[in-house]
Design a protein with these regions (language model features):
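Bacterial N-terminal signal peptides
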Residues: 9-18
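Bacterial N-terminal signal peptides that target proteins for export
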Residues: 1-10
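Beta-strand-enriched cores of mature, soluble protein domains
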Residues: 24-165
Length: 165
């Protein structure tokens, strides 16, 4: 009798544990290329070269798993002679229509920038996503004639979990 109860308890435990899914952490590394499509800059007359503003960047994001996304990033900046801080909201739209929205903060130093932040929203296969995003080094091309801001490229990392299905 005791063996039957033990066996029944074991079967029930296996069924319960088997039905419950656990969210697992995922990491997606990517490369990106962006360009400024809109820009507005305002000079602040407190010190030489101080400016604030925003720009909108569009670009392509290629992930190491073969996935590709189109990205739009709204960048708010405060810098003096090209060095300062930035706050960004980015939206990655994947080929299947799923999206990942991020909010990052960072620094810019003339020819390079870096940012870290969090994933704040997702749709489609990324519904319920939670996690972080990081671009350890964003590099800028030389400013070309007629450009208000240079094109950028770099690497990034998405670390995230999705809710159990």
């Amino acid at each position: 009798m005791a063996i039957r109860r033990l066996f029944a308890g074991l079967v029930i435990a296996i069924l319960i544990l088997g039905i419950t899914s656990v969210a697992t952490a995922e990491t997606l590394n990517y490369k990106f290329y962006t360009r400024v499509v809109k820009s507005e800059t305002f000079l602040i007359p407190d010190v030489d070269g101080h400016e604030v503003g925003l720009n909108v960047r569009d670009g392509v994001y290629a992930f190491e798993n073969g996935d590709v996304a189109f990205g739009t990033t709204i960048v708010f900046f405060d810098r003096t002679k090209g060095v300062g801080s930035l706050n960004q909201y980015g939206t990655l739209t994947f080929r299947d229509g799923s999206t990942v929205v991020t909010r990052t903060v960072g620094t810019t130093g003339g020819t390079a920038a870096k940012s870290t932040g969090e994933i704040i929203h997702g749709t489609g296969r990324f519904q319920g996503i939670k996690g972080t995003v990081m671009s350890p080094e964003i590099k800028f091309f030389r400013l070309e004639k007629g450009e208000s801001h240079p094109k950028s490229f770099g690497d990034g990392i998405l670390n995230y979990t999705l809710p159990p299905k």
